[in-house]
Amino acid sequence: GKIVDIDTPADLFRQLVDKHFDGDLDSVVHLYYKNLLRMVELGGFDIVGHADKMHYNASCYRPGLLDEPWYDALVRKYFTAIAEYGYIVEINTKSYHDLGTFYPNKRYFSFLKELGIRVQVNSDAHYPERINNGRAEALAALKKAGFTSVAEWHNGKWEEREIE
């Protein structure tokens, strides 16, 4: 098969799904999570980022995808695999002020806590002026979900830093 970049704005995502997958969103979502599970198995990294950005991209097809049980089951299976391998999950805040969402969506924060997954908060470095976008809100949401600390890179290693 060919590589199709789906980390795009929703309108371009729709065009790519229509062109390369005949508009079959369900197949794209299942293939996406299948490949993410394979990535987790192969490893070679510390952090898993943009853990459920698919819900945003796919919103151009089905705005309620995040609420569909089959989608939720895929995301939970993915997080369970992440927990088994001991990776850190990035809580990405870049789009919080524009779109009102984190990646992963905050509805999964309690599940991450339940699984014992460590989390790390960042906003990407694509836009330096957005480096702290949504950080305070993400930390507050994590605290509400039961987290007391987040992972941060200091002096060449991951350390837990208390959420104040």
Which sequence ranges carry the predicted segments?
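Extended substrate/RNA-proximal surfaces in nucleic-acid metabolism proteins
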Residues: 1-85
